[in-house]
């Protein structure tokens, strides 16, 4: 086995922490001595030991003189855990192979520099593309302090998310729907508009056994969410946030008594200011959001510049219907050359359905975003 093979093993280990480590990154580590794998570890949960320490602790023999493969640059600062570079030095590791550099300002090359200063041979950028992709959520959050937002929708091949009657269960098959549940476990928050609550009364939880429910975020400008809706009735069991512009204390109190949190925000173009919402959620360590909104909220999110990724689940069906709903509504763009561009698309087959996952490429920051950063 070579460096890439061992790093692939470290990547597989890192993925075991999916859904549990946020707002920390997913990290895997492998200790190799004289061609033998003697230790493996991964960051299992936020606040617990990091991958490097777990790998070293699992070693079946003395790791002195061994090589450590780790998907992300070792940390060198005190947080909830002590610096991993200290553990590496104490163990007598001879060489470290790193997948991704850590953009966290508290690390950002310092971890590698410390190792080299102590005579450890460091190889950088082993399977960098794969290691970077693993932690795209963390990289976005640690550099912007705003959640990574993935717009998710299921549609027919003619671009409909419901029939003209509003019926939408089910567009995709069971395999695709199970994939969505894994996304709900993976993302820290799930966001919809009040229109989705009124139309579907969804529960918005993760239905995987042993999975983690995302924080539910409802964009509800005027507090129209029914008190008998599933999200309100279960708010004491699953964290639920109502993002609103309604400052009426009596209205707010009814939801608060049910267990909901109220975030009262500024109004922007008749709706909740999504940029302000992202800033507040980021401050609460919500590093990622699965946006399962309808066409109105999806357009507002794109227009605000908060969407980093689109996940389109496409079923081999045709609904037709001039009035059938589409994933993105709003005003739309005026000409094709000013469309929102998508890049780095990935295609995955899920039974008879397809998932297309793409990054959103904004040609420039929206004016409202620029103003918010001044």
Give the location of each predicted region.
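A broad detector of short, well-ordered amphipathic alpha-helices
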Residues: 8, 12-15, 39, 50-53, ...
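Short alpha-helix boundary/capping motifs
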Residues: 59, 116-117, 142-144, 309, ...
